[in-house]
């Protein structure tokens, strides 16, 4: 890699996130976009939602507007249906991703297609560059089987967006971004190349 990848980066902040709710009462943990970390450009928001109590998610996210950024929803467990004002619709299931570019504006909903069981996943908001904020809205539904997996010593990398070890993920961001789901067994480690000019964060959701 270039010089930008030849030094270790220091962790400058550790936060626990804010337990809150959004939509029609969906319980979640807000990591970015809360009082501890308002934003980390280009990351505007990062939420984890997860519960096996349907009362925590059954209300879903009724129609609401987005504009000027991208939303990436990564579903670990469960099933959601998304639908928008242009007539587009699709489903999020175990391990799948929905990549929505809101651009000049869209109204959409994300509603659970289950009445019991575990519903767990993440939503990330990415800011669009100023010159792209008024582009037409678009969607990319990415099934779990389209996300490459890389076996590493003591672990696994799912490449949602970006490139690592020559493997590219299916996500296509208008802003440069890497998005990996990494599993490591105890006492193992991994080095991830990140340009020195980029902001980055790690979220530990198990372990």
Describe the residue ranges of each PLM region:
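Short, structured patches in soluble enzyme cores that scaffold and shape functional sites
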Residues: 123-130, 159-163, 183-186, 205-206
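Conserved metal-binding segment of the jelly-roll/cupin
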Residues: 92-107
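Ligand-binding loop in jelly-roll beta-barrel domains
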Residues: 103-132
């Amino acid at each position: 890699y270039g010089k930008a990848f030849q030094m270790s980066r220091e962790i400058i902040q550790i936060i626990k996130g804010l337990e809150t709710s959004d939509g029609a009462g969906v319980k979640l943990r807000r990591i970015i976009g809360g009082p501890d970390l308002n934003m980390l450009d280009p990351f505007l928001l990062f939420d984890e939602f997860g519960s096996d109590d349907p009362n925590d998610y059954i209300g879903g996210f009724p129609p609401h507007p987005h504009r000027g950024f991208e939303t990436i929803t990564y579903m670990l467990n469960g099933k959601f249906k998304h639908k928008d004002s242009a007539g587009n619709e699709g489903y999020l299931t175990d391990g799948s991703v929905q990549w929505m570019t809101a651009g000049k504006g869209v109204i959409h909903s994300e509603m659970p297609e289950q009445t019991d069981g575990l519903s767990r996943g993440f939503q990330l908001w990415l800011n669009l560059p100023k010159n792209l904020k008024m582009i037409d809205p678009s969607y990319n539904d990415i099934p779990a089987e389209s996300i490459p997996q890389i076996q590493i010593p003591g672990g696994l990398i799912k490449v949602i967006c970006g490139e690592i070890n020559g493997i590219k993920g299916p996500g296509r961001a208008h802003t440069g971004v890497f998005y990996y789901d990494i599993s490591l067994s105890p006492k193992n480690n991994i080095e991830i190349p990140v340009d020195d000019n980029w902001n980055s964060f790690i979220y530990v959701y198990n372990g």
